[in-house]
Amino acid sequence: MVDDSHNAPFDKTKFDEVLEALVGLKDNEGNPFDDIFEELPSKRYFPDYYQIIQKPICYKMMRNKAKTGKYLSMGDFYDDIRLMVSNAQTYNMPGSLVYECSVLIANTANSLESKDGTLNEEENEEMESSINEEHKPGTNEIDVPKVIQNILDALHEEKDEQGRFLIDIFIDLPSKRLYPDYYEIIKSPMTIKMLEKRFKKGEYTTLESFVKDLNQMFINAKTYNAPGSFVYEDAEKLSQLSSSLISSFSEQPKEHSPATSKHEPEETPASPTPSVSASTSRERSTSVAPSFITSDQAATPDVLKSEEAHVESFSKESEKDQTPIPEDVPSPMDTLSQANYGAFALIKSFPSTPVPDFLNFSHKSVMGRSTFNMPNFPEPKFFEDIPNTERCILSAFICSPPQLPLPNPLRMYLPCPSLNSTEVSVITLAPQHSFLNIVINLNPALALKSYTIITLLNGKRLGAGVSTPPSTLYALEGIKHTEEPIRTVYEAKLSVGLNCLEFVLGSTEPVEPPSIEPGLPASAYSRTVERERFVLMAYVQP
């Protein structure tokens, strides 16, 4: 049953009370943030906002609509609140101040609108009502297990134009460590894996019970992800496909095999027929990389796949990177274990070669050394020594340059994947955050050792490596190193689309000379060996 407050006639007094409650909200530090949503962003400073956001809305516009009588029901007002939240989460990166404040607004508005905080129950009811009408006792009886199996097989085989399986995003739940807010927003998590487990246990005795869980999975995806995002669109397409298949199967008598007929859902041009064997579907689903990958999940490395067509040419399986890798350094792109909220919607998995061939891509990204005042970040972890099991590259700070007049500058802390140099960090950036200061924090124990840091952007080395000055080594000889991390600062201008930043730390090892030649420096009898590589994939939204 839909909450009556949504369809209730518009009440100006109730409107004022709800808006006052939303305006009075404060962030985690106790600071009000109503000014962020009071008016629309400046067209002068944020022209791209009005290219990305098609229906801008703010508190001021809501007051004007209430004053001029444009709200016919309280539901119209709450719909504008949800639109404002969706706009904020579409334009701003997850983890930013605006994004986090929008989540708080959404939760508060939902609880005010309905006592039990139910969201989007209309979609469940529409699906269930259509099923109840089409599957009443005495009408066309169907083989429920066979229909469910065909629906699952069809969902597993649905692809987009680039050949990407849409169901991959819905196989597993997000990591609680990487996405803690997911479980605060989504109260009834559901995945394809959970559906299949219940199906195998025989818990779905009716088609209605299966469709209810299936529809819950799509509602969760459309609640947590903003409209227009990859996940939201995939959920919409799969929801249309499942609805079409259910309608088609319900029209067939039990003795008729649904696997022999073709079903072409509307508005899904590349949809497969449901005549897919269960064994074929299960074999494919076990080989794909799940959209949320944690350190305890193994995924077969695949080619790099991105949402943008201009990157597609670099993700062919036939491409082989010839960059040599020392035997003691694993390939840096074997697995994807760290990801930002939106990253899984843009990138599926990474190749096993160390660096994709981005050199032929016509990008305008630049990078160089930079000096600036360090923001107040939390101190990174450090180590007293550097055994083989500890990291030398500790973490990275990413922030907007202080000279840019941004109302919501970016500030991000990225811990390096612990004890595993094969993991990759992935972030999604809003267009206004394409100018960055990147701070690499090194283990302070390196102050007593000879090391080299090399930076690469899209596979191309940028400038000379930053090495430890010999004078520093002599001055610190025999002195215990400080606990302050060694920081190297870079300034980067990233282009729209996918950017690959790599920070390679090498150490110098002595090499026995073939013969003693007077006059040669000691460096002539040494070599640089790659020890660690921190890889950051940054996707700048268009």
Swiss-Prot record:
Bias kind Acidic residues: ranges: 119-128
Biased composition (Polar residues): 286-298
UniProt feature, compositional bias: Low complexity: 268-280
GO cellular component, as recorded: chromatin; cytosol; nucleus; RSC-type complex
Region annotated Disordered, chain positions: 114-139, 246-327
MF-aspect GO terms: chromatin binding
Domain Bromo: from-to ranges: 6-116, 139-249
PTM-bearing positions, type Phosphoserine: 257, 271, 287, 313
Matching SUPFAM superfamilies: Bromodomain (SSF47370)
Compartment annotation: Nucleus
Keywords: Bromodomain, Chromatin regulator, Nucleus, Phosphoprotein, Repeat, Transcription, Transcription regulation
CDD domains: Bromodomain
Summary of subunit composition and partner proteins: Component of the RSC complex composed of at least arp9, arp42, rsc1, rsc4, rsc7, rsc9, rsc58, sfh1, snf21, ssr1, ssr2, ssr3 and ssr4. The complex interacts with histone and histone variant components of centromeric chromatin.
Protein name: Chromatin structure-remodeling complex subunit rsc4
Source organism (scientific name): Schizosaccharomyces pombe (strain 972 / ATCC 24843)
Gene name in the database record: rsc4
